[in-house]
């Protein structure tokens, strides 16, 4: 009776060959390398946000929370992959001990999917943070804690809601070869992937529009205003919107590769051998790659922005002596 509900306990020859193959072990090395690099750059990015922050306080807070979440997600992914590789060595000749029962994966699934969804919906928080900043800057800069806290709460609700739809109440039956694979009786994952994609596409459209408006506004301010504060705010707004735009596009590309890459090879499962399918699937860990992109963009964008600021200051002081003289010249040229 249990076998009818759970499915076969013993791995088929194709799954055994795939899980003990060199390509799957290479995929583990690639994923482990990406994860350790993400740990290293997450530390650098957190230090950059705390010591040399180039973002608004609201954006900074959202990015810090997302970085901490990415560390938890990477740790969960690493633990799952180590567990899988360990079994592939120890039980290579015992197919009935190679697979994981759903009950063995419950804790890993909880952390993996919650942090996965939280990472996905970070695009929502970052997009609306920029949107509010552009359309209501006075409210935004006076209520930054309220804005960031509200957006993070919505992000959490979206993550828990998606987890509830996908995994809550799923019967604890079935076997999988890697613990983050979709449980046997979880039937809503295709709908979840579609919903996540819609959210991300919507956010990409909105943030590109906000970035366009920020660039246009900054050019107008550079032409019509000689207020250092106003010009500085416009420049910083463009830089932040550009960084968020890059983050969202990279996040979308990585998650699209994961969600639809796996769905695509599943749709072709009947056309390929079971061994080929289980050999290819471990490479499609999109959120793992996205969790490396996040600290990379924050860290290198911070360094680039600081360098550009120094260059601008050096040009101003070398050409016009001091900032006061420079602003007087600008004022005369605009009169």
Curated annotation (Swiss-Prot):
Similarity field: Belongs to the nematode receptor-like protein sra family.
Membrane topology according to the record: Multi-pass membrane protein
A Pfam family matched in the record: 7TM_GPCR_Sra
Chain segments annotated as transmembrane: 22-42, 151-171, 195-215, 245-265, 280-300
Protein name: Serpentine receptor class alpha-25
Assigned keywords, A-Z: Membrane, Transmembrane, Transmembrane helix
GO molecular function: G protein-coupled receptor activity
Major site of localization recorded for this protein: membrane
Entries under InterPro entries matching the protein: 7TM_GPCR_serpentine_rcpt_Sra
Organism: Caenorhabditis elegans
Transmembrane helix listed as a keyword: yes
GO cellular component, one term: membrane
Domain of life per record: Eukaryota
């Amino acid at each position: 009776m249990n076998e009818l509900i759970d499915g076969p306990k013993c791995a088929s020859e194709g799954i055994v060959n795939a899980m003990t193959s060199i390509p799957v072990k290479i995929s583990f090395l690639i994923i482990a390398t990406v994860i350790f690099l993400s740990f290293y750059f997450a530390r650098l990015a957190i230090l950059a946000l705390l010591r040399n922050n180039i973002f608004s306080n609201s954006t900074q807070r959202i990015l810090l929370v997302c970085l901490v979440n990415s560390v938890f997600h990477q740790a969960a992914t690493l633990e799952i992959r180590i567990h899988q590789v360990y079994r592939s060595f120890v039980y290579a000749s015992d197919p009935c001990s190679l697979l994981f029962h759903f009950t063995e994966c419950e804790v890993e699934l909880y952390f993996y999917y919650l942090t996965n969804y939280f990472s996905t919906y970070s695009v929502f928080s970052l997009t609306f943070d920029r949107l509010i900043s552009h359309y209501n800057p006075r409210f935004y800069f006076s209520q930054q804690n309220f804005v960031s806290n509200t957006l993070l709460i919505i992000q959490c609700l979206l993550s828990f809601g998606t987890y509830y739809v996908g995994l809550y109440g799923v019967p604890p039956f079935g076997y999988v070869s890697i613990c983050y694979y979709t449980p046997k009786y979880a039937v809503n994952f295709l709908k979840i992937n579609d919903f996540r994609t819609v959210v991300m596409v919507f956010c990409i459209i909105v943030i590109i529009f906000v970035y366009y408006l920020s660039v246009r506004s900054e050019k107008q301010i550079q032409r019509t205003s000689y207020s250092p504060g106003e010009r500085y705010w416009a420049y910083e707004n463009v830089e932040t919107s550009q960084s968020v735009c890059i983050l969202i596009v990279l996040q979308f590309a990585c998650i699209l590769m994961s969600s639809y890459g796996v769905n695509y090879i599943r749709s072709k499962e009947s056309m390929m051998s079971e061994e080929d399918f289980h050999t290819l699937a471990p490479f499609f860990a999109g959120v793992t790659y996205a969790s490396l992109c996040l600290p990379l963009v924050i860290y290198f964008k911070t360094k680039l922005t600081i360098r550009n600021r120094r260059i601008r200051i050096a040009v101003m002081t070398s050409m016009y002596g001091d900032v006061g003289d420079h602003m007087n010249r600008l004022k005369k040229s605009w009169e």
